[in-house]
Amino acid sequence: MFKIYETELAGRKLTIETGKFAMQANGSVVVRYGETTVMTNVTAAKEAQDDIDFFPLSVDYEEKLYSVGKIPGSYNRREGKPADSAVLISRAIDRPIRPLFPSDFRNNVVIVNTVLSDDQENSPEVCAQIGTSAALAISDIPWGGPSAAVAVGYVDDKIIINPNCEQRAKSRMKATVAGTKEKITMIEAGADNISNEIMLEAIKAAHVEIKKMCEFIQTMRDEIGKPKFEYKSFSVNPEYFERVCNELTEEMTNAVKETDKITRNENVDKVSEKIKNIAIEMFGENAEEEHKFDIATAIHDLQKKCVRSIILNEHIRPDGRAIDEVRKLTAEVDLIPRVHGSALFSRGQTQVLTIATLGTKADAQSLDGIDFDTEVKRYMHQYNFPSYSVGEAKPSRGAGRREIGHGALAEKALVPMLPSEEEFPYTIRLVSEVLESNGSTSQASICGSTLALMAAGVPIKEPVAGISTGLITDLEDSSKYIVITDIQDIEDFFGDMDFKVGGTGTGITAIQVDIKNDGLTYEIIKEAFEKTQEARKMIINDVILKAIPETRKEVSKYAPKIIAMTINPEKIKDVIGSGGKVINKIIDETGVKIDIDDDGKVAIYCDDIENAKKAQKIIESIVKEYEVGEICEGTVSRIAKFGAFVDLGGNNEGLVHISKISNKRIEKVEDVLAVGDTVKVRISEIDDQGKISLSMKEFETITDTEKEEKED
């Protein structure tokens, strides 16, 4: 049955339709916000997957170019693989809804969000977040929502919910906040050094609207929601797990209490063998095959129980650290020859090598998406996580969603601190290679980025560091919890959150929050902000600035040299010339690359600074605007009966009429001048069309013979 539900979000009408599209999906809705329209379809497999130990959820966000009246530029005119921006939105939709599925649910679930139209004012991402929650809520798929999400901006010292296009352009914050009626379930943000206090107020303001949307979706659920289907529960055999806990809890606790990751894994493997042996004793010699799930789950759950117990009850970490203690940190720069900047940042057994490369404007990345204007990125950060970083032997398959997400987080952390294009007219690419991983590699990439940029001579405004906090909550009483600083892999894996924050010592530039429980309270978020800020201050002052106290004064000798200048936009055509004749001649003569913007900004690139200066001089002569009375030097370029044409340089030419060549009467120009002569001239007139008239009379030299004739 076709139904339309209407509400208001941030002062604008939002509608959710269901019962018309995709009727065979488990749940289907169309969300309209202004003229932005997103269709969300959710489907679930009827049978569970027996051979996996995780919940198989897939979330896609599809940006269709027809939504903004564009035709794809590919050969076959089809949309290609999702852009990085679409991947990031898919991840942002996934993270708040995943913890709300039953923990023992193993049916494959696929969620597809399709942008049907985008009015460039109302966020399709917000529509997709709301559509996902609504479609799941009214479907028969087991899920503990509803949840909702809104975008948040900060313009003119005011928090704006779901900012429009104009507000987004001026905003010092670009954040997406998701939550349930009770708690916050996801934060994704980039910000211009925003304080903890303002960020927390923004989250609270977002939650007000989130609560309203959750109530709205719950109304839909109550009216038209399908009964949730029954599913095969995947949970460990209780008698088996009870025996495992009774016999091996102390041994597993000792196994995970280890500083070295490799040794810890070896210890856990030994205990795991004993867990398998208990299964064989209880279920027979085929237990490893027939009770594979029970064994794997028992190993996982016992580790989780022990790690959480150590932190909650002993107030120490599995590796012996205090609750707020950061692992040993080291930083080095200039490790790799010939590259433009390099840095190695290590935090315990997490190690990241970051390389900076400086390029020309032509190296900037064009992002052709559903925005009307093609975005051009002059700063890029890419993150690679090879299997050898965790001691595994797996082939590389290129960047996946996780790599794209971590790279984007480290990228947005540094963007507010970059110099303007006018101040530093380079394209900048950073690549972070994870060499060793024991948690928080994305935050190590942020620190490595700061070091590599400073080593490359990029004049960043302030150093930026990144740190993660984790959460361990008492499963019996959620009001009892501990927020821990600088989480390693097992604390992330068995804990309740990974709260990543990048920023300076005073403010926040990036946030990414993943949770595994039912959400975070304001108190937990506030504590996470405070602890990450203290850790960032320490990392910046005690590690980063000791490795490189200030940004290099000059770029690497291997980096291209750039001269930036600004010309009158009306003169651009003169620099380029007919069919590019003039600019190509400059390039051929000097070996430089030249970029010219429509507003007259010119960038000259060359490995040899002297050649760049030569090209600059030529361009300056081309765009030079002469004034009447100005004295110049030029070369006679051609001769006519009525005068001589003088090349003033830079494709500028003036005429010396025969009457202005000499104070004496001359019959032929050739009697006085020849092509190639260097002459001094004065600008006598410039007409409305820019034609220049010259005079040489003022500079005529009187010869000795003329002096004698004059004296006689």
Labelled PLM ranges:
Residues M1-K232:
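Long, basic N-terminal domains or extensions that often function
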Residues A25-V109, V115-S117, N122, E188, ...:
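Glycine-rich, flexible beta-strand/loop modules in the N-terminal catalytic cores of phosphate-handling
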Residues R95-S103, I138, L335, T360-D363, ...:
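Conserved helix-loop functional segments at active or binding sites
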Residues S103-V109, G144-P146, M213-Y231, I262-T263, ...:
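Flexible, glycine/charged-enriched surface loops at secondary-structure junctions
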Residues Y558-A564, P569-D712:
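Single-stranded RNA-binding regions, centering on S1/OB-family and related RNA-binding modules
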